Amino acid sequence: MGSVRIRSVIKEDLPTVYQFIKELAEFEKCEDQVEATIPNLEVAFGFIDEVTPVAYGVFIEENDQPAGMAIYFLNFSTWTSRVGIYLEDLYVRPQFRGKGYGSYLLSYLARESLRIGGRRLDWVVLDWNQRAIEVYEKAGAQKVGGWSMMRVTGENLKALADKLPGNF
């Protein structure tokens, strides 16, 4: 392991962020679901003038080469009335796995959550990704029993939006 550092994503990194997204989608067997574009990432990360970022990202680098990435956003708990961090994606390239880089990224985000007054770090993991589950449990994460992730997309999202009466 050479020189290792974690740093924030900058605008010039967006092609690499996009590449990581495609690599993650391939790993998760979801390549056909990637709709991301570099212009959309510019907006999401707030790299367009007067646009508030809705996503943040960090790279872990080995010898100045991107080895892994975490993309996250702020969330809020009504129960604690505190901000937190939701980890959207964590990906370590295959040749860099087994070096603790995923754990370092989790620790970085835990520190960031505490820095902003947060009380937790949330994410979901594919149920077949046993290696990741083991890393997360070793880091102190627990499965949240009794909860199921829900999602509305595409035509169902439009249909749901259309159910709201026009006077709203």
From Swiss-Prot:
Keywords: Acyltransferase, Cytoplasm, Nucleus, Transferase. This is N-acetyltransferase ats1. It comes from the Eukaryota. CDD domains: NAT_SF (cd04301). It is found in: Cytoplasm, Cytosol; Nucleus. Residues 4-167 form the N-acetyltransferase domain. It is an enzyme of class 2 (transferase). The keyword Nuclease does not apply. N-acetyltransferase that may act on a wide range of D-amino acids. May also acetylate histones, polyamines like putrescine, spermidine and spermine, and certain other small basic proteins like nuclear HMG proteins. Its EC number is 2.3.1.-. The record marks 136 as: Important for catalytic activity. The keyword Nucleus applies. Belongs to the acetyltransferase family. Its main location: cytoplasm. Pfam families: Acetyltransf_1. One of its GO terms (biological process) is putrescine catabolic process. Disulfide bonds: none annotated. GO terms for molecular function: diamine N-acetyltransferase activity.
